[in-house]
């Protein structure tokens, strides 16, 4: 099993309909009876060897009420969701760029005191890895999903959800074959040597790693950090990309950049402007990408961690001096160059060798690096999760909302990004029914105040320019 990730992933989804928990429980139980999907109910067990404590899976011969394949808890309220002190504050899309709320405020809707929060909490108990908390109101439903990050990454979670939904809709023939008990990534260390990694010169030595850790310690010493959701209208992202493409066209160079490239470049420059790091430092921008289509395409479905970062390393002064198209294109080039099969092999060789020798992965960047990490979960289709077969009653009338029956109107990740050990972490949770981008970031509280001022200014400028709402 993947023994690197100790984080617990916690996702919370709000539905503006009444969703029956029993239908979800039955369909999930059925999924765990199909082929290798029964692995999802495995227990984590420690296994000691010369390299220290590692972990492995033990799969019960049969799942029973006393030894289930997953935990599915329920809470039911006779009132509407608007009367609940926590669930009533779950964010909704606003008309313009907006900061929607602190995700930690909603953690109580998922894991409860005493529930596992780290891999070791699972390893020394007999608990299954999948936890669900289903809260039903008379007009809405909140579902919290929790699992150790070693079980699934964002894209793997999307594969799991699509398989579950296929069973819920009675389409078991659409459930993909899940990989067996061998690690599909094991061959990735057999290709190019670590020295072929394009950023090999940016691998930090132990002294540089200590300096890097000191920078991180200093940055977090006097200021608390907070995760919040920033919702970005579809039209704003389209305008950003159009402006970037115009700038690139005028330069007579490469012209393709994706929405993700542009969104990441805009956020990185904005965060640099409000955080104010020394301009002679380096920006280390880590854009996580899915390796399945390149390195695991011949394998059955693989849900464990299969993402690595495409790193862009640039002087901060240059990032802020050049137009946004410069950083967007650098992000695109880094992704194209580093997602090749030889680079994936070299990266895995580097990291696995380090883990085997020291128990820790190597740090890539600069000793004074201002590090940001970003992951785009849009292809996990969290906002397109169709639970309509389990919807027993419509909550909010369809004419008053943009979502279809049984689709989520809010998606949050309550996992604190501080676990990632970087200065600023973020992810794209996906696009809602109107095409608006839901992103989530970890910043200092003072920086959130500055970002709110910037977004208000942008909204005012766009409203003035268009002569209508943003």
UniProtKB/Swiss-Prot annotation:
Transmembrane segment boundaries: none
GO molecular function, one term: acyltransferase activity
Pathway(s) served: Secondary metabolite biosynthesis
Domain of life: Eukaryota
Knockout or disruption consequences: Blocks the production of protubonine B and leads to the accumulation of protubonine D.
Residues at the active site: 149, 386
E.C. code: 2.3.1.-
Keywords assigned: Acyltransferase, Transferase
Subunit note: Monomer.
Family: Belongs to the plant acyltransferase family.
Its job: O-acetyltransferase; part of the gene cluster that mediates the biosynthesis of protubonine B, a hydroxylated and diacetylated cyclo-L-Trp-L-Leu derivative. Within the pathway, pboC catalyzes the acetylation of protubonine D at the hydroxy group to produce protubonine C. The first step of the protubonine B synthesis is performed by the nonribosomal peptide synthetase pboA that catalyzes the formation of cyclo-L-Trp-L-Leu by condensing L-Leu with L-Trp.
Protein name per its UniProtKB record: O-acyltransferase pboC
Organism encoding this protein: Aspergillus ustus
């Amino acid at each position: 099993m993947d023994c690197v990730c100790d984080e617990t992933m916690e996702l919370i989804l709000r539905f503006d309909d009444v969703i029956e928990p029993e239908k979800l429980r039955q369909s999930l139980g059925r999924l765990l009876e199909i082929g290798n999907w029964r692995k999802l109910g495995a227990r984590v067990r420690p296994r000691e060897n010369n390299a220290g404590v590692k972990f492995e899976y033990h799969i019960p011969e049969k799942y029973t009420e006393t030894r289930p394949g997953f935990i599915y808890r329920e809470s039911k309220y006779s009132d509407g969701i608007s009367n609940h002190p926590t669930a009533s504050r779950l964010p909704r899309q606003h008309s313009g760029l907006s900061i929607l709320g602190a995700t930690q405020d909603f953690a109580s809707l998922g894991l409860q005191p005493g529930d596992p929060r780290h891999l070791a909490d699972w390893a020394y108990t007999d608990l299954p890895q999948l936890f669900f908390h289903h809260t039903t109101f008379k007009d809405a439903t909140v579902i919290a999903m929790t699992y150790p990050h070693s079980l699934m990454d964002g894209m793997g979670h999307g594969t799991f959800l699509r398989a579950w939904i296929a069973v819920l809709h009675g389409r078991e023939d659409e459930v993909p074959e899940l990989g067996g008990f061998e690690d599909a990534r094991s061959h990735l260390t057999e290709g190019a040597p670590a020295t072929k990694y394009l950023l090999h010169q940016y691998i930090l030595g132990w002294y540089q790693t200590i300096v890097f850790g000191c920078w991180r310690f200093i940055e977090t010493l006097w200021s608390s950090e907070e995760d919040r959701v920033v919702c970005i209208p579809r039209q704003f992202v389209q305008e950003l990309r159009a402006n970037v493409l115009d700038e690139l066209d005028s330069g007579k160079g490469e012209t393709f950049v994706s929405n993700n490239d542009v969104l990441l470049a805009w956020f990185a420059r904005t965060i640099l402007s409000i955080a104010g790091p020394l301009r002679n430092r380096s920006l280390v921008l880590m854009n996580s990408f899915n390796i399945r289509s390149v390195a695991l395409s011949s394998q059955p479905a693989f849900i464990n961690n299969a993402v690595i970062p495409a790193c862009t390393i640039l002087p901060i002064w240059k990032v802020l001096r050049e137009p946004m198209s410069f950083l967007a294109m650098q992000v695109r080039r880094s992704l194209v160059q580093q997602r090749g099969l030889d680079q994936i092999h070299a990266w895995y060789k580097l990291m696995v060798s380090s883990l085997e020798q020291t128990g820790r992965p190597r740090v890539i960047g600069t000793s004074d690096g201002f590090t940001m990490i970003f992951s785009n979960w849009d292809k996990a289709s969290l906002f397109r999760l169709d639970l309509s077969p389990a919807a027993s009653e419509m909550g909010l009338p369809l004419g008053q909302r943009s979502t279809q029956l049984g689709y989520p109107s809010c998606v949050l990740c309550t996992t604190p990004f501080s676990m990632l050990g970087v200065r600023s972490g973020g992810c794209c949770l996906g696009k809602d029914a109107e095409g608006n981008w839901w992103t989530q970031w970890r910043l200092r509280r003072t920086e959130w105040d500055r970002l709110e001022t910037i977004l208000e200014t942008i909204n005012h400028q766009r409203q003035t320019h268009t002569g209508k709402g943003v």
